């Protein structure tokens, strides 16, 4: 959870730099996300009981197996890229809508020109900040059990997770709605329609989790596990050939 979430933050910033665009996040935004929307759910995941019977029924790891084997590394990369993708989508939404209104040709240069306007950049950063924060909360819910749908889990077995996610959403809303916090974080208030749009984007990590669980239950090998296993076997074959 933490590795994929932090990778999402890094990729969000790195992609904007490569495109020559202003930063989607301010330093205060990153600090807030790391302290609030990362830390609280991570603590809740750390004390999650999970299903002990199922865990004990799984075969043990071999001594030579990496901690990131069986799709672990692939999952980190996938969710990190997904979180970065939806955060950048939110960031681009504001200038894109203005470009559409003015019938301007879509290009990175035009996008950068619109983002040079202070009000446009401020709202775009608010969008990216909100999605990055909320998506990690949704992501934490799915990470309670990567092999089980959230509808099959028992949410009240980990009340700390409910509290962590609830507090996370309230605090994330506070930084865009409370005047004294909007001044500190340089954010703007959002309308109901904007909140619904950003919440919809933020759900994607959880939707991806449910999709992978569904594929696995239907007899399809878990995509992340298959990719990770293929990569491991490829590396092992190369070592043998050497």
Regions found by a protein language model. Name each.
Residues 1-148:
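Membrane-embedded transport module
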Residues 3, 46, 68-70, 96-242:
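C-terminal transmembrane module of polytopic membrane proteins
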């Amino acid at each position: 959870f933490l590795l994929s979430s932090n990778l999402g933050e890094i990729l969000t910033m790195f992609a904007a730099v490569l495109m020559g665009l202003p930063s989607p996040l301010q330093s205060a935004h990153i600090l807030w996300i790391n302290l609030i929307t990362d830390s609280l759910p991570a603590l809740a995941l750390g004390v999650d009981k999970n299903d002990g019977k199922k865990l004990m029924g799984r075969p043990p790891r071999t001594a030579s197996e990496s901690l990131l084997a069986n799709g672990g590394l692939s999952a980190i990369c996938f969710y990190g890229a997904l979180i970065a993708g939806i955060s950048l989508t939110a960031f681009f939404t504001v200038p894109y809508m203005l470009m559409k209104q003015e019938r301007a040709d879509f290009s990175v240069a035009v996008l950068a020109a619109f983002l040079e306007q202070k009000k446009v950049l401020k709202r775009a950063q608010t969008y990216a900040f909100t999605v990055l924060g909320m998506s990690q909360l949704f992501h934490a819910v799915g990470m309670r059990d990567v092999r089980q749908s959230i509808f099959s889990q028992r949410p009240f077995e980990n009340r700390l997770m409910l509290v962590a996610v609830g507090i996370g959403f309230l605090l994330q809303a506070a930084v865009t709605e409370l005047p004294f916090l909007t001044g500190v974080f340089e954010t703007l208030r959002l309308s109901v329609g904007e909140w619904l749009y950003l919440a919809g984007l933020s759900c994607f990590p959880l939707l991806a989790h449910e999709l992978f669980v569904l594929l696995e239950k239907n007899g399809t090998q878990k995509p992340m596990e298959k990719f990770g296993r293929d990569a491991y076997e490829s590396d092992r074959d190369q070592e043998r050939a050497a």
